[in-house]
Amino acid sequence: NKPSRKVVAEDNGQSIEIVCTEALPFKTSTDNAPVYYYLENVMDAGTRLYGNGGLKYRAAENASAVNDVRNDLWYVTGNAFDGLQFHSVGTEDVAKSYAALSTSTSLTAGSHLLGYNDMWFVYRISDSTFGIHAYSGFNRKYLAWHMEDSKSEVTFGEPGKSDAFAFRMVEPTFTFPMYNGGDGNVYNTFAAPFDVALADDNVKMYKGSVNTAIHELTLSQVDAAPANAGVMLLGENSSANEVTLKAVSGVAALEGNSLVGITGELSDLTGKLILGISDQTGAVGFFTAGSSV
C-alpha cells in the first residue's frame, strides 16, 4: 500500500513517518517454515516452473509419480521492500540470473553461476498474478522475467503486463487414486517424501495402530501426515475415484502410528501387510499370504 498526503509549508524541517505495508498475492516463508506453492506462468492456462537438477518447464498437470511433486514446489522468503528470493525445493537453490542482468541471459535455479542476482521485486498485473523484476546495473533499467513462446526457458525483458510476464503462486495440490471396496466405500493407502494434507472433503485420512495379538487395526482420523508416514485414506459412502491432496510443511509425527510408508516399489512382499479385498469374504483389510488384519 502506498500512503500519501499533500506536503505543506509547515512540514519544512519536520520529520514525517511513512508507514508502508506489503500486500503480496502469496504468503512469504522462512527456511524453517516454508509455505509451498507451484510457480506458474499464465501462458496456455499455466506453464509450471519446476526444478529437478535444473530449471525446467511443463504444463500444469499432475506429476507422473507422487514422489516427483516435491520437485515442483517453491517457497518465497524476504519482503517486498528489501527483495524476495524464490526457492526451488527440487534444486534446493533459488531462482537467479547472472549479476550482469541483461536481455541476453536466462533464469536458472542452479548453483553453477559465478556472480549472480537472486533478489527480486514484484509488480501487480492482476489480483492473482504479478511480474518479477530486478534492477539491471548493466542495462540501467529494470528487467522482468519473461516466458519464451516455446516455454523452454525464462528470459528477461522490459517489464510488461502480457501473459508472458504474468506469474502466479498456486496451491500445490495433486490427485491420488481411490479404489472401490465393493462395500460402498473407497480406500487406499498413502505415503510421500514430503508432508501432505487433504484438500477436499470426499475422503478422510487415518493413522493406524495394529494389535498383532488379535490381528486388529484401529484407525484414528488425522488432518495431515508427515513425510514418509503411512496413512489410510477412506471415503465412506463414496464413489470418488480420486482424492485431492496438497503439499504442506511442519506436520508433527503421528504418535502411535503402525503404518509404514513406502515411497518406492517393493519386489519382495514377504511379511508385508497389503491393503486388499478378501477373495473369500469380500471384506476389505490388510492381508499377507497367511494372515490378515
Predicted feature locations:
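Extracellular glycan-recognition/adhesion modules and their associated mucin-like linkers
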Residues: 16-54, 68-104, 119-150, 159-173
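Extended, compositionally biased repeat/scaffold regions that form elongated interaction surfaces
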Residues: 119-120, 196-215, 271-276
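Short, flexible beta-strand-to-coil junctions
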Residues: 39-45, 87-94, 102-104, 134-139, ...
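Surface-exposed interfaces of beta-sheet-rich extracellular modules
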Residues: 1-5
